[in-house]
């Protein structure tokens, strides 16, 4: 009979059975079952080799027979995972312990309560522990914040110890490194960003342009300005050009002025409505002067952080002084140059710090020798008085809207490169565009070119320019609008009423065009050609204002006369607003009321953030307010009666004009005036 086989010898037989050497084949066992099944059973029942080394299995009984190690199922594959299957311990006490070198905390507590953990060893920080089970195996457990853990371990007789170092594993060291790594990286990042802001080592190419360049000026610098604009390209601002040409000549020929004791102007402020060419003049100065040129917008000074505005002003003038003589151009200076001292809000106003620094740089203790400051604004009334005094801005150049001659020159400049028809007359266009700025005229010619291209024309004719003018003034035509015949008739009589009253009012603006084509929010329009002299002077007589109110009410009067009181519409709402505004100004501001007298009441309120009053204050009593309302109503009623008298007297001309409008939709001034030849109309005499 073959000698009994122990578990350890069986494990040896399992290992040798998988080798290809025939000399190591295990001896045949006297068992009726096949050998591979018995070996598979041994592999499933034998513990792992490390466990056998730590806890040696007890020697088998002398009477132990190898048949007790048979596989439970003879159908099992004898070669399935023969080498990869880890042998399991045979001890019943460790049979339900978790596998692996790291246990979950719940598995650890379950094993402790079952008495299967012999000892634990905590790491120094208490975040990990290493356990030793009763079968000798070891595992690690991540320990949460459980205040009852020590009591549970002591109750179940577990030996507790604490490691002197990070004996529990690499987790403690990694945690230590992680705690130091984030502050180090944050500090290094901030250091790198501030080095970039200062332009020092690590600032990158050029040292500037980093994301932390808060305190540096963002002005554009040109050593040799190439703006592409000279004084030849600036038209319609002859007086402004003369003022600036002296500044340019001073830079080019300083000896001519210094020989007579003259000093170069330190600053020049360009003042004028939007679109009059202030920035264009500055570009022309840069193109003519031939000296270094700095340009920036005032809104670039004040941004996100407090103190940035003053810092950027200092940086700008430091660069300019290094390049002196030079020109610094600040566009829209009212963004930082507004009046100080409003004192609202109780906080610090960053704009005040910026303007204080600007005042110091322009004419402070150190001075700004060789730096000429050009600035542009369309709000000179809100600028601080200290900024406007001589020594800072020695000159204030007014760039006003061009007159007829100026508009002709501007149209000639903006028509360069455009194919124009022979019927285009710049003189007529200029007279039809009173009050237009250079930007408006440039837009007019561009819109005319777009219309000509849309119509597949080779040239720009006067029709395209006329249509573009109406588009700019009143909006695009509503070609697809569906208008009933009754509405067209009502609009025709409404516009005819405006034109008829305007034509028969003495010393009023002539009618230029009448149209019932819907444009924008208007169903029809009547164009008048205002006097050039009146626009330039800004002086309006009392009779002109009274005529203006009567003309505005002519549309409503025509509706009432033709369609009756019950069928008038809301089309005159804008006319009423205009009439009320003119009448109230005549009473409150212009002194055209006998009862109120030669006084101005109810002045406009100022903006508190400009250092002015909070709101308008009524400086008159309620009784005076009643008198003002009565005077306004009297002026409006007088204008209404004048318009009614004209329309009822010349109703035949009203019918002819309305019929002509319904047929042609558009009637020009000359065609309209031809109706008066047969009508024998006379001017209205009050």
Curated annotation (Swiss-Prot):
GO terms for cellular component: chloroplast thylakoid membrane. One of its GO terms (molecular function) is metalloendopeptidase activity. Zn(2+) binds at residues 494, 498, 575. The chain crosses the membrane at residues 173-193. It is a single-pass membrane protein. Its cofactor is Zn(2+). This is ATP-dependent zinc metalloprotease FTSH 1, chloroplastic. The lineage of its organism: Eukaryota, Viridiplantae, Streptophyta, Embryophyta, Tracheophyta.
